């Protein structure tokens, strides 16, 4: 309800040091043409802002952005510290505006250089007042307290941004310790009666140590650090001319904002009305304007502006259109917009262009190289919004066809069977408890191939009269008669395989089953039958049927391997033995000779049962083994026992054998030695 960024307090150091110049000189030569030699040499037409002016301008610009994007929701206060703390505004809505703050800052004025150097001038007075201001409730918190919500349940967090200048890290450490001590004391005062304000749940202290341009500081930067459960502190050292960039960078994180630069804005030249030039305008808005638009096909073009340390998204200006309802595209969200440099001529021209009722479309590039209109700028009721347009498929578009999936067009899905399965599996609320409810999940199908060409069993159920009844019994309760009838059907199937009958396939849809022989088709059918029964073996009759099928496979020389007899892989719920990896193994069976068909078939079955755990190394190794099995190994490896070294050319150099071979060639016998 109450976020940390609801309360922000600026503590500005108003000591003598802030009266010195920032050493960034601005030219005052407004005459046309080249500057005179006297002005260039003497430098009389240049001036430099003081550290106080840089701090005031950047902090007021910070609160302008907050009040533009969150009108009436986020609160910013200012406290000026010298010999005492001077309160510039309060949490009241009447003082939360630019005119009140700027008039008060004019009355404060720049610190005087004749101010005495005394220990009474310190930023600590402002830090104490900031903690007291955090304990004061805002209008929203006061309403919550009036509605009866306990004070402990009202979250009170805030952020303090202190702009000062310290000598070294020791001075910064003392500021942290003093702030933490005062914070704890304030919570003690808020907890004890009479209560003085709300307790502070957490505070985020940001210390900006600013120095003139070209001066090295002995204070080191430090990221966010938790000092205590109540306090987080971060320190930034920055040059006075760059403090506005630093605060713009910080506000992006403080309020979850994003920066967008509209590029290539055509604008008439001020000095020559007949020509035009392209300008850029940077705007700030909620980060969600980009996050809800981008999809996987889009990338945000980002860049870093000169002098800044944060990224800005670059979007290109498109041809302006009317702001009618017919021209609007599907919109995902709209967010308020404010320019970064509100006083520049390009920003004022863009704002006036939008306030006159025109709209601007913005483009972003795709990964493919083309562009898409992703955002639109328009104004309503005197406020400018950025609209995030839908550049991907929206909910109003028709859903893509299930056939147009990855890997090509698939047109053999079992759509009607899937519809029947969904109707059978629908859930209906019951008034009373059903005693058979625990057994219902067991009766649901656990094996459902998605396509017709990935299964043999369900492909044949329209052509074998007994198969639909067989499949129905597998998922239902089975008695002894059903078990005997199913065993008879399995025996008839094996007899048909022994006779060499071909399975009644009406079509193969792309000749996916052509490489298989009739025997291999039956083996695929047996394997799928066993897999289906094994997944639904919940009763004694199902288990008896599974044992009889395995016994028949062993009797016909098609016994399952050890790995096949293990647990069924989870992928088998939606796959069949005709999945791509298994088809490759079956193709090798039909191509190889009949002598090696048994071993290759068993190897393919092992691959079928373990397909879910195969790696790329396993696939390459199995392919190399299948190639090496096609040729005989060397005789030395075959005849030599394991662990011994085979002798190369064992008959080479044997004189008796050489003489016998020569005599045999000449027809003369050689008597053996006694």
From Swiss-Prot:
The keyword Disulfide bond does not apply. It is found in: Nucleus; Cytoplasm; Cytoplasm, Perinuclear region. Pfam families: Mat89Bb. GO terms for biological process: cell division; centrosome localization; dorsal appendage formation; flagellated sperm motility; meiotic cell cycle; oocyte nucleus localization involved in oocyte dorsal/ventral axis specification; posterior mRNA localization involved in anterior/posterior axis specification; regulation of fertilization. GO terms for cellular component: cytoplasm; INTAC complex; integrator complex; nucleus; perinuclear region of cytoplasm. InterPro entries: Cell_cycle_regulator_Mat89Bb. It comes from the Eukaryota. Disulfide bonds: none annotated. Keywords: Cell cycle, Cell division, Coiled coil, Cytoplasm, Developmental protein, Differentiation, Meiosis, Mitosis, Nucleus, Phosphoprotein, Spermatogenesis. The keyword Oxidoreductase does not apply. Phosphorylated. Residues 516-538 form a coiled coil. Belongs to the Integrator subunit 13 family. Belongs to the multiprotein complex Integrator, at least composed of IntS1, IntS2, IntS3, IntS4, omd/IntS5, IntS6, defl/IntS7, IntS8, IntS9, IntS10, IntS11, IntS12, asun/IntS13, IntS14 and IntS15. The core complex associates with protein phosphatase 2A subunits mts/PP2A and Pp2A-29B, to form the Integrator-PP2A (INTAC) complex. Component of the integrator complex, a multiprotein complex that terminates RNA polymerase II (Pol II) transcription in the promoter-proximal region of genes. The integrator complex provides a quality checkpoint during transcription elongation by driving premature transcription termination of transcripts that are unfavorably configured for transcriptional elongation: the complex terminates transcription by (1) catalyzing dephosphorylation of the C-terminal domain (CTD) of Pol II subunit Polr2A/Rbp1 and Spt5, and (2) degrading the exiting nascent RNA transcript via endonuclease activity. This is Protein asunder. The lineage of its organism: Eukaryota, Metazoa, Ecdysozoa, Arthropoda, Hexapoda. The gene is asun.
């Amino acid at each position: 309800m109450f976020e940390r960024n609801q309360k922000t307090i600026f503590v500005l150091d108003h000591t003598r040091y802030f009266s010195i110049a920032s050493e960034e000189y601005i030219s005052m030569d407004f005459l046309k043409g080249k500057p005179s030699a006297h002005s260039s040499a003497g430098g009389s037409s240049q001036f430099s802002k003081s550290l106080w002016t840089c701090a005031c301008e950047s902090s007021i610009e910070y609160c302008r952005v907050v009040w533009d994007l969150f009108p009436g929701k986020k609160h910013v206060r200012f406290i000026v510290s010298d010999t005492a703390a001077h309160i510039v505004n309060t949490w009241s809505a009447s003082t939360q505006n630019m005119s009140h703050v700027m008039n008060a800052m004019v009355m404060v004025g720049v610190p005087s250089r004749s101010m005495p150097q005394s220990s009474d001038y310190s930023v600590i007075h402002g830090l104490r007042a900031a903690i007291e201001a955090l304990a004061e409730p805002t209008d929203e918190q006061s309403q919550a307290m009036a509605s009866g919500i306990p004070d402990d349940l009202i979250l009170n967090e805030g952020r303090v941004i202190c702009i000062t200048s310290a000598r070294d890290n020791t001075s910064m450490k003392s500021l942290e310790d003093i702030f933490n001590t005062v914070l704890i004391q304030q919570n003690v005062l808020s907890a004890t009666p009479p209560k003085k304000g709300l307790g502070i749940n957490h505070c985020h202290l940001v210390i900006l140590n600013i120095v003139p341009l070209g001066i090295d500081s002995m204070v080191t930067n430090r990221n966010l650090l938790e000092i205590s459960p109540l306090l987080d502190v971060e320190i930034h050292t920055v040059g006075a001319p760059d403090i506005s960039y630093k605060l713009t960078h910080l506000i992006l994180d403080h309020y979850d904002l994003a920066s967008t630069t509209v590029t290539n804005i055509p604008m008439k030249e001020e000095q020559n009305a007949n020509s035009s030039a392209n300008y850029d305008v940077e705007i700030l808005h909620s980060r969600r304007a980009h996050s809800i638009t981008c999809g996987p096909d889009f990338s945000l073009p980002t860049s870093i502006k000169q002098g800044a340390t944060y990224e800005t998204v670059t979007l290109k200006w498109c041809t302006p259109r009317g702001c009618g309802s017919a021209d609007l595209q599907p919109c995902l969200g709209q967010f308020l917009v404010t320019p970064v440099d509100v006083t520049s001529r390009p920003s004022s021209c863009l704002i006036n262009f939008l306030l006159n009722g025109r709209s601007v479309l913005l483009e972003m590039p795709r990964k493919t190289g083309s562009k898409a209109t992703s955002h639109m700028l328009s104004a309503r009721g005197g406020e400018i919004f950025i609209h995030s347009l839908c550049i991907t498929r929206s909910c109003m578009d028709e859903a893509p066809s299930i056939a147009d999936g990855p890997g090509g067009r698939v047109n053999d899905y079992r759509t009607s069977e899937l519809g029947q399965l969904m109707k059978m599996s629908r859930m209906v609320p019951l008034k009373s408890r059903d005693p058979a409810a625990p057994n219902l999940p067991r009766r649901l199908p656990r094996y459902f191939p998605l396509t017709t060409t990935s299964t043999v069993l369900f492909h044949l159920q329209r052509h074998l009269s007994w198969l639909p009844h067989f499949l129905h019994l597998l998922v239902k309760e089975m008695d002894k008669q059903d078990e005997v009838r199913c065993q008879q059907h399995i025996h008839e199937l094996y007899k048909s395989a022994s006779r060499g009958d071909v399975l009644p396939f009406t079509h193969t849809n792309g000749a996916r089953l052509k490489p298989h022989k009739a025997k291999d088709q039956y083996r695929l059918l047996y394997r799928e039958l066993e897999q289906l029964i094994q997944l639904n073996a919940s009763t004694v009759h199902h288990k008896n049927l599974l044992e009889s099928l395995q016994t028949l496979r062993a009797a016909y020389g098609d016994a399952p391997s050890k790995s096949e007899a293990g647990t069924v892989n989870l992928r088998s719920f939606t796959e069949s033995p005709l999945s791509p990896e298994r088809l490759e193994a079956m193709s090798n069976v039909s191509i190889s000779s009949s002598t090696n068909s048994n071993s290759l078939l068993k190897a393919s079955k092992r691959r079928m049962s373990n397909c879910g755990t195969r790696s790329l190394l396993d696939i390459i190794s199995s392919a190399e083994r299948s190639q090496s099995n096609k040729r005989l190994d060397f005789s030395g490896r075959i005849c030599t026992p394991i662990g011994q070294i085979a002798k190369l050319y064992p008959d080479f150099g044997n004189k008796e054998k050489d003489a016998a071979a020569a005599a045999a060639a000449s027809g003369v016998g050689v008597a053996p030695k006694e």
